[in-house]
Amino acid sequence: MINFKNLFSGQSVLEEVDSPINGKITVVKSLALGTYFQVGKLTQSGGVVFDIWKTTLNKVRSMVTEPNNILILGLGGGSCAKISRKLWPYTHLTGVDFDKTIVELGKKYLGLDEVNADIVVSDAYEYVKSVSNEKKEYNLIIVDLYVGQEFPVIFESDGFLENVKKALSQNGLVVFNRLYFGEKRPQTVKFFNKLQKFFSKVEYFYPEANVMLICTK
């Protein structure tokens, strides 16, 4: 049966999947926004998220020299990875996500398998701890670790931030994606203040409803 509501709104649901990490993930195809993933009431990958990262990474491009090594913590469906690959075609790109389900959906619907990235299904905290112990360094680290609307507190901990800093090259940048509406605003301001204790410089950038916290080692 034709869903006239979806027909007239210009969007359709391609698939719904239950993830043990993110809960229900809905894959939506929209005439206006293309294909995107919705988790709860937020777009997780594709659609407006793609535009947010495109704006952000073009800003970052003017702040960092050509990166040899990029680490994305919270790969999701791969929006950030696709844009990074286009902006820096010769970089070594690593994407980490704990949710295998959303990674597989990214390959199926958003072209993640065409990005030429090392994809690691792992806990971001443990991964960063491991690479920092190995003294592995990245010129650009992107931290996008929301589960729905929640940013797990472990990724605000001293231990995590210390390991991220260790994994960052001397002239590198780390970008934290944070929500910035309602009750999220004071949480993000508090986190911004904490970052200033770990990094020599912390700037903020507003692409739409989010705020990006851009840190220099």
What are these regions (language model features)?
Residues I2-W88, I102:
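Class I S-adenosylmethionine
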Residues Y36, L173, M212-I214:
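Ordered hydrophobic segments in well-structured contexts
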Residues G40-L42, V49-K54, K108, E134, ...:
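Surface-exposed beta-strand edges and their flanking turn/coil or helix-capping segments
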Residues K54-A167, L173, E183-Q187, E208-N210:
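The AdoMet/dcAdoMet-binding core of the Class I SAM-like
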Residues K41-T43, D123, F199:
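Short, well-ordered turn and helix-capping elements at secondary-structure junctions
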Residues Q11, D18-I21, Y180-K217:
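Class I S-adenosyl-L-methionine
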Residues V48, P152, L179:
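Short, surface-exposed alpha-helical recognition segments that flank or form part
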